[in-house]
Design a protein with these regions (language model features):
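Short, acidic, metal-binding catalytic loop of nucleotide-sugar glycosyltransferases
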Residues: 21-30
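A recurrent flexible, glycine/aromatic-enriched loop bordering the glycosyltransferase active site
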Residues: 120-121, 138-157, 173, 179, ...
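A conserved acidic beta->alpha catalytic loop
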Residues: 37-46, 91
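Conserved donor NDP-sugar-binding/catalytic core segment of glycosyltransferases
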Residues: 96-127, 202
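Short aromatic/hydrophobic "clamp" motif used to bind/position activated sugar donors
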Residues: 84
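Catalytic donor/gating beta->alpha subdomain of glycosyltransferases that bind UDP-sugars
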Residues: 169-229
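Membrane-embedded multi-pass helical conduit in multi-pass membrane proteins
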Residues: 240-317
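Glycine-rich, basic loop-to-helix element that forms the pyrophosphate-binding segment
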Residues: 63-79
């Protein structure tokens, strides 16, 4: 089975070596690896070029200001094979990742799309809390194994699927993968799962980086029209808190303190729910979970703030001023 692996990258000098090493050490070697650089200003291109000189099946395509969707489209268009595997920079595949994806096709030759699984990297306390806060809990069981939510960055599909759904949206920095998956579902392609095809996904390392990333996620999720799946609940939650604050304002001079207390209680309740939902994935005693609770509260507040800022950026820049998204 000949497979082309497509990887969109931009300014990934810190992670690209690990990704390339993982792809070059696959037990099922890809027939072709296509790296599409979207305009890196760091050493990413040089690193890929060095490896390409050593491995003839590794190719680098350079684009200018290409977002992930365009990068995947360019890579898929240049692919020499019918089967396309997608993975992202900042992600590290297990050595049998590609073999496990291909095995799903062998078991069902009618398969059009295979989704693998992914695991967040939790090598620091902050990343552990991040995984609990926004790393999705596996909810779908396949062959007695629970898998994570479907992700393009751990997938294998026929070239005809990519053509059939007209590729990825090229104007979005994020959420283009969610739209792509939705189009696949709407088109009725045959989907299989490979829960043992695992990649490891790097979380953001601190609050500031998390805030910046979620502002981008939020803005582009709005551009993609997927706000009901995310922003709606956040806006309702804080809308109700604002209503409570307005009522308290007319009743007592203590309204700021009471409102702050309600805000903290809301965050703590969500943190406790997150800990409970992740109790099997990240088991811990009372002391460890108490520590996690105090890590989760500011993290959830940061994500909520970023979500609202992203919505505001979409409203002002994209709806009112009509500026192109970046």
């Amino acid at each position: 089975m000949n497979i082309t692996v497509v990887v969109p990258v931009r300014n990934e000098e810190q992670s690209i070596r690990l990704l390339l090493q993982g792809l070059l050490e696959q037990t099922l070697a890809p027939a072709e690896i296509v790296i599409v650089d979207g305009g890196s200003t760091d050493a990413t291109r040089r690193i890929v070029e060095e490896q390409a000189r050593k491995h003839s099946h590794l190719h680098l395509i350079c684009e200018t200001d290409a977002l992930p969707g365009k990068g995947r489209n360019v890579g898929a268009a240049s692919a020499a094979n019918e089967w396309l595997a997608f993975i992202d920079a900042g992600v590290s595949p297990a050595n049998d990742w590609l073999a496990q994806l291909a095995e799903a096709v062998r078991l069902n030759s009618q398969t059009d799309v295979v989704y693998g699984s992914w695991e967040p990297v939790t090598d620091t306390f902050f990343k552990e809390c991040a995984a609990i806060a926004y790393g999705y809990v596996p909810t779908e069981e396949v062959d007695a194994t629970f898998i994570q939510s479907r992700a393009v960055f751990s997938s294998l599909l026929r070239r005809s699927v990519w053509l059939g759904v007209k590729g990825f949206s090229e104007e979005l920095r994020s959420a283009e993968d969610l739209l792509f998956i939705k189009r696949i579902d709407d088109a009725g392609f045959i989907v299989s799962y490979a829960p043992k095809a695992v990649v490891r996904w790097s979380m953001q390392p601190n609050l500031w980086r998390t805030f910046r990333r979620f502002v981008t996620y939020s803005r582009h999720n709005m551009l993609a029209g997927l706000w009901k799946q995310w922003q709606a609940s956040v806006l309702i939650r804080y809308g109700l808190l604002a209503v409570c604050a307005a009522i308290l304002f007319g009743l007592t001079s203590w309204w700021p303190i009471i409102t702050l207390g309600l805000f903290i209680l809301m965050l703590m309740a969500r943190a406790i729910v997150a800990l409970w939902r992740n109790r099997r994935r990240y088991p811990a005693g009372v002391l460890r979970n108490s520590t996690r609770l105090f890590g989760l509260v500011p993290l959830l507040a940061t994500i909520d703030a970023a979500t609202i800022v992203g919505v505001a950026a979409w409203l002002v820049s994209d709806k009112l001023l009509g500026r192109p998204s970046v």
